[in-house]
Amino acid sequence: MDADEVRERAGSLPREPGVYLFEQGRDDKRRVLYVGKAVDLRDRVRSYADPRSERIAKMVERAETIDFAVTDTETQALLLEANLIKRHRPPYNVRLKDDKSYPLVQLTDHPVPRIEVTRDPADGATVYGPFTDKGRVETVVKALREAYGLRGCSDHKYSNRDRPCLDYEMGICTAPCTGEIGEADYAEDAEAVTRYFEGETGVLADPLRREMEAAAQNQEFERAANLRDKLGAVEALHGEGDTAVSDSGGYQTTDVLGAAIEGERAIVARLHAEGGKLVERDRHTLEAPDGEGTAGVYRAFIPQYYAERELPDRILCAEAPADPDIEAWLESEGVTLGVPGAGREATLVDLALKNARQRGGTDDESGRLADALGIDHPSRIEGFDVSHAQGRSAVGSNVTFVDETPEKSDYRRKKLTEQNDDYANMRELLRWRATRAVEGRDDRPDPDLLLIDGGDGQLGAARDALAETGWDVPAIALAKDEELVITPDRVYDWNDDAPQLHLLQRIRDEAHRFAVQYHQTLRDEVSTTLDDVPGIGPETRKRLLRRFGSVDSVRAASDEELTAIDGIGEQTAETIRTRLQ
């Protein structure tokens, strides 16, 4: 990729945290060259247009595509980046030799579970994380033990104790080993800890806050300060673990699916977790099932995708595929199908949906248009066209496409000044649209892109109107016949099968159709009105329609203009005037 290609691709990326991947090759032969994280994907990727090192410059030169995935937080991006580097081992990433993983919190699979911070969770454990700040995690685990008394000793020590250990004396363990607390009560305390990691911060934050306030009232300021710091760690920890998947129930691998429908196609985003850690993500495109919604997308995707792939232990979706055969097949393969309504899994499903709905990839037409033009992703595009009959009865159309689909409730049309000047008519049409937008008289959202039906002259006229009114929206034109895409800076001659060209052609053709339809409506109005005028036969009526186009134009015509039409003398002209007054 050269610098211009990098800038074009960067312009299509969202201003959100996430990870980006420079890749070589396409489709099944893609090789990941480099993985990076970003607080702002667009700005970070744009910086690669001017790489600071020779190594990265070579990487950019070899790359053919740039893929990405959005995350909710910068921390999630950091964790996903680390796991993608581990999985793909990209040649241009610098990897630590010990290749250590991030800390996790586990509740062991035991009737009296222990809680601990670990990088290597035990089989069957309920795992939370990963987290980036080990010190903060340890502070939270200690606070949980102080509040609920969960043990931290090994199973061997637990089974061989005959009296409470020092942890009991320190108040961080309730000594279930010697029966100081019953298993049922201990299980309730363990459940409270689970609720904290599943998102109920208050089970720990609320008692800490009460203790802090009491210490402050008793002027125990040092203790109050310590409790304040501990409370801060407890509340901050949830900002790190949003992508964690609980491993309770023996689920070592989990696929989280999010689906979105975009016109005639559907996008499915898959997030893959292993051992509680998000380690992979991808997006897939398929035809959208007719009238079935996203449940139909899941029903089509699951059997196709997993037919020749290893099934995970669990699949989470935003909604069930509503197909008993699929559910029976998954059950027979030992796969749990779930639709989480709340908690950490539901948060991860939301993230999968966010990735599915995220435009700007290489699969959608508007995303490719953004790539090709180097602009922000144009989810909302308005098209403009002018139609007239020999300079008379000029009308303008303004159509709207949202996510590549016509939004007919946002179509508008306008009668234009009667003059045989395409540029002036386009300038008037755009001035009307822009003025209404700037003055707040148009209830439609501002578009991301304007498409002008015409060539350089029409585009220039439109841009004049935009500059005059101060409406800051990018505009391009699609020229007829040669199908050239014209921007203020250059002219694009794309291949006939280019997806981005197909999108512009659909918008241009729809704007033209809507303008012609409106013009025909006005002509029909003229025809209907002229039917009642004595002395006007079918042929004369056709000549009037071709010459004037609208009732207003006929009404405004002079005697000389009317009598210039074959079949209309002075008396007929006077009759026309009388009937149209």
Swiss-Prot record:
GO terms for biological process: nucleotide-excision repair; SOS response. InterPro entries: GIY-YIG_endonuc, GIY-YIG_endonuc_sf, GIY-YIG_UvrC_Cho, Hlx-hairpin-Hlx_DNA-bd_motif, RuvA_2-like, UVR_dom, UVR_dom_sf, UvrABC_protein_C. Pfam families: GIY-YIG, HHH_5, UVR, UvrC_RNaseH, UvrC_RNaseH_dom. One of its GO terms (molecular function) is DNA binding. Residues 202-237 form the UVR domain. It is found in: Cytoplasm. Residues 15-94 form the GIY-YIG domain. GO terms for cellular component: cytoplasm; excinuclease repair complex. Keywords: Cytoplasm, DNA damage, DNA excision, DNA repair, Excision nuclease, SOS response. Signal peptide: none annotated. HAMAP family: UvrC. Interacts with UvrB in an incision complex. Belongs to the UvrC family. The UvrABC repair system catalyzes the recognition and processing of DNA lesions. UvrC both incises the 5' and 3' sides of the lesion. The N-terminal half is responsible for the 3' incision and the C-terminal half is responsible for the 5' incision. This is UvrABC system protein C. The gene is uvrC.
